[in-house]
């Protein structure tokens, strides 16, 4: 038998034995606990409940009985149900207040404050593969901040493959130009063809920026005038820039243009309206002297005829 009886045995005024069911759960230091349980459920009912349960669940059962008995004593009508309902209503009120506070906070800070910050790739020697794939789509000359600069040696094979498509493109342009020239010649639109391909009506070719004079314009002495520099159109200058850039001139295209030159008429002027030619000094005087020499024989012959008629 224990030296000090438990709270249940002391309240019931009986001896507390070693087999007492209440001794482990109702210590003598807290007699109010057994008073509430005994007042609501009764000692005999509590004994039956504890005997039907395993030892590891008895302590939790005693605590539940105590809480329920205390609530029933404080509120005889609702008991623990009223306390549970009060706690549920209080929880709903707290949730509503929290939602209202969040809405006010969004109104003060703005919608941008709620958006999470963008993902920044880690800076290191080996960036992730997704970041490297995104760098491949960037234009040349753009270096992302925080990334090391990688210098690679030029690949000669890539340069060779890059040059081949350019040559093929030039050949295609030349063949297309020849085909267009033949079509425009058949249509009879020579003036539009001459203006489009850099061929003047006086027989000069301005594809390379120089004019070539016809043989008919040479003097009687057989002296050839030097090539004269002409100011071509914008298309001619662009074509000349492409030819000089690649280091060679498309001779087939020039030959085709020379074949399409119309014959010069007598007395046709070398320069047209809107085209400026820069000839070397002394060429104009040379042509004037040659024309005077050609005109002298007919004049002398006419003078001799007049003298014979007078006699």
UniProtKB/Swiss-Prot annotation:
It holds the Pfam family LOB. Belongs to the LOB domain-containing protein family. Residues 264-277 have a biased composition (Low complexity). InterPro entries: LOB, LOBD. Residues 287-296 have a biased composition (Acidic residues). This is LOB domain-containing protein 10. Residues 4-105 form the LOB domain. It comes from Arabidopsis thaliana. Residues 297-311 have a biased composition (Basic and acidic residues). Disulfide bonds: none annotated. Residues 264-311 are annotated as: Disordered. The gene is LBD10. It comes from the Eukaryota.
């Amino acid at each position: 038998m224990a030296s000090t009886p438990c709270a249940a045995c002391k309240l019931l005024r009986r001896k507390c034995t070693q087999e007492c069911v209440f001794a482990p759960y109702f210590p003598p230091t807290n007699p109010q606990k057994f008073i509430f349980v005994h007042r609501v459920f009764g000692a005999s009912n509590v004994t039956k409940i504890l005997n039907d349960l395993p030892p590891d669940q008895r302590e939790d059962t005693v605590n539940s009985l105590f809480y329920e008995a205390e609530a029933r004593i404080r509120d005889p009508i609702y008991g623990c149900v009223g306390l549970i309902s009060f706690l549920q209503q209080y929880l709903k009120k707290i949730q509503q207040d929290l939602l209202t506070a969040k809405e006010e906070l969004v109104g003060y800070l703005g919608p941008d404050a709620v958006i999470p910050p963008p993902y920044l790739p880690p800076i290191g020697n080996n960036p992730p593969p997704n970041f490297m794939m995104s760098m491949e789509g960037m234009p040349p000359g753009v270096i992302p901040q925080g990334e090391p600069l990688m210098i690679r040696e030029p690949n000669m094979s890539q340069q060779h493959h890059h040059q081949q498509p350019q040559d093929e493109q030039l050949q295609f342009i030349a063949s297309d130009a020849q085909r267009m020239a033949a079509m425009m010649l058949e249509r009879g639109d020579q003036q539009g063809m001459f203006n489009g391909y850099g061929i003047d009506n006086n027989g000069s070719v301005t594809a390379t920026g120089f004019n070539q004079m016809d043989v008919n314009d040479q003097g009687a002495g057989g002296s050839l005038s030097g090539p004269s520099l002409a100011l071509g159109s914008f298309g001619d200058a662009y074509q000349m820039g492409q030819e000089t850039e690649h280091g060679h001139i498309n001779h087939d295209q020039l030959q085709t243009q020379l074949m399409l030159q119309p014959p010069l008429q007598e007395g046709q002027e070398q320069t047209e309206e809107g085209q400026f030619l820069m000839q070397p000094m002394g060429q104009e005087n040379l042509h004037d002297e040659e024309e005077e020499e050609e005109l002298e024989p007919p004049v002398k012959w006419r003078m001799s005829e007049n003298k014979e008629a007078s006699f």
